[in-house]
Amino acid sequence: MYSLARPLLFSLDAERAHALALRSIDTAYRTGTTSLLSTRPVPLPTPAFGLMFPNPVGLGAGLDKNGEHIDALLALGFGFVEIGTVTPRAQDGNPKPRMFRLPEYQAVINRMGFNNLGVDALVANVQRARRRGGLLGINIGKNKDTPNEEATSDYRYCMERVYPLADYITVNISSPNTAGLRELQEEQSLRRLISDLRETQEALGAQHGKRVPMLVKVAPDLNDRDIDAAARVLADLAVDGVIATNTTVTRPLIANHPLAAEAGGLSGAPLLGQSTLVLRRLRARLPESIPLIGVGGINSGADAVAKMAAGASLVQCYSGLVYRGPQLVGECVNAIRRRREAPSGGAVAPL
């Protein structure tokens, strides 16, 4: 079905196509025809962060920023869906155009800039969702006009609002599209922010009588020293998990493309090697008690297996769906299933 719809979607501006695709998925869900888009995979229960995921393949943050399509997306067969990034207050994001397809590379460049309706709107949407068939992650960020010195208050506010509703919460400090945000990954800034949020997490756990895991999403543009520092902080503060990685600001594999000079984060196939390398290095530096989600460049079941081989417990897709459609979900689940059933038992590949 997606192969028939793709030419129409690709004839539209990327952001308009994004909106149309979501409306189509919603329509299929409401009319009971989701099976025409995607066959729900046989369950492959996977433990991580003290949770049991129906399968290890999730949707990365950014597709459903406001939590308006949760049930329709879960119906495609994802084991979990991550919504957001959401900020305390609504914001428009960056000026359009701000999303670009690079079909020759199966890639996307975006500079959306955390456009969202604000955390209160997201909370209302989540409360209306039925949430059958998978788990829900909520990705939180800061408003663009909040200085980094005050960022903790934005993250704390979002965490307090979504905590009762989320299965896990992701702290996004790695988007390249909010000025200065990635500075929060620097060791001292990271330690201050995550320490404060860990205290908030523990207080909220006591208040609500449940512990919601807190994950941190990192950039792919980290050198070895950056990775060492981040791993040291995240291990010291005992975060529940790490998502590796966000989009990249580098362009070595698409340097000759006319859109290479566009500002924003590059995702899709060209990100696979770089993001998987960061994933593997983090796995080597973090204790096994901190599971990793591998995301970046997954366009096939083999790509998902590469993430698992590098040390991921779970994976997420996003840009790959633009080029492959919802069938990518089941393909990834089945590829991971075959790997898990292989005689090697899914060992982590060495550095």
Curated annotation (Swiss-Prot):
Residues involved in FMN binding: 61-65, 85, 139, 172, 217, 245, 268, 297, 318-319
Cofactor note: Binds 1 FMN per subunit.
Catalysed reactions, as listed in the record: (S)-dihydroorotate + a quinone = orotate + a quinol
Record-linked NCBIfam families: PRK05286.1-1, PRK05286.1-2, PRK05286.1-4, PRK05286.2-5, pyrD_sub2
EC number per UniProt: 1.3.5.2
Disulfide partners: none
CDD domains linked to this entry: DHOD_2_like
Membrane topology: Peripheral membrane protein
KW Oxidoreductase (keyword) present: yes
Gene name for this UniProt entry: pyrD
Annotated InterPro entries: Aldolase_TIM, DHO_dehydrogenase, Dihydroorotate_DH_1_2, Dihydroorotate_DH_2, Dihydroorotate_DH_cat, Dihydroorotate_DH_CS
Protein's UniProt keywords contain Repeat: no
Binding site for substrate: 65, 110-114, 172, 177, 246-247
Protein name: Dihydroorotate dehydrogenase (quinone)
Entry GO MF terms: dihydroorotate dehydrogenase (quinone) activity
Family in the record: Belongs to the dihydroorotate dehydrogenase family. Type 2 subfamily.
